[in-house]
Amino acid sequence: MKAGANIRKICLIGDEDQLPSVGPGCVLRDLIASERFPLVRLNHIYRQKDGSEVISLAHDIRRGMVDPSFYHQDVHFVSCADTAIRDTILHIVKQSLQMGYSMDEVQVLSPMYRGNAGIDVLNNALQASFNPPDTEKREVQSGYRIFREHDKILQLKNQPDDDVYNGDIGILEEVTLPEETEDKRHALFVNYQDNIVCYRPENFDKITHAYCISVHKSQGGEYPIIIMPFIRSHSIMLYRKLIYTACSRARKAVWLIGDMSAFEAGIQVEERHVRRTTLQQRLIYGTTEVVDTDENDFPF
C-alpha cells in the first residue's frame, strides 16, 4: 500500500476460514471484525458442482461437526493403522490413475514433513511407485532428493524474474548432464504450464517433489482429487482451518486416510495458536496507538 501512492480504491478478496499468512498478523480477519468497511460474502460455490458432498463436508468442518452420512461418493474415509497409511495412499493414487486422472489431478496433502504419513516419506514412496528409475529417464541427486525426468515439482520460493512463485507445481521435463553444458554443471528444466524454468545446482534448494505437499503450500490451488492422512502424531498441526483448507482444495473427491479420531479431534480445535494483534482496535478507535484493552484479551 505504501508503494501505491495513487490508489483510490482497494478490493480485498479472501476466505477468513482458511489458513492465515505465514508472516505475522491476521489482516483479513481483523478488517472484517472491525466492521469499518463494506463487506460482501460470496456464497455460491463454483469449484464443486451443485450438491457435491465436498461442499457439505467443508461447511460441516467450518461448524466443527461432520455428519458421517457424507462419506459416500465424493467424500471417503478409509480407517487404517498408521503403518498402513502409505500403502493405502499408493493404492488410491493408482486407482485414480486407472480411472483416467493424471498425476497433476491427484494431490496428496499432509500437515507435517516427518513421520509415517509425513511429506518426506510419502514423496519418496509416490516417486518410487509412479516415476521409478528408468534407463530412459535422466536424474540428478541433490542432498537426500533425487530429481528425475517426469517428476512432479514444487516451487518453494518466489522467482518473479522467471514468473514462477512459491507453491507453483510443474513437471521436470529435462535433466541436462554436466558434459552437455558449457560450465560442466547439471541443469534442470521444469515446465510450469508452458513456462519453462531452468535450475542450476545453486538453485536446486528452491524446488522439491510435489507428489505430496503441505496444506499451506496448497492454499490457493485446486485439484480434482485430494488425499490426506490423519494420524495422532500430527495432532499439533491438526486444527479446523487447516483441515477446512485441505478439503476445500478438492473439486470432485476427498479421501481422508487413517485415524478417524484424529480427524474428529482436529475439527474441534478452532486455533492452535491464536494471533494477538491490535489492527482491529486501531481501526475501531481511529488511532495508531495501542488502545488499552481488557487484560484478559491481551495477557501480555
Give residue spans per PLM region.
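Short amphipathic alpha-helical segments and helix-helix/interface helices
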Residues: 1, 28, 243-247
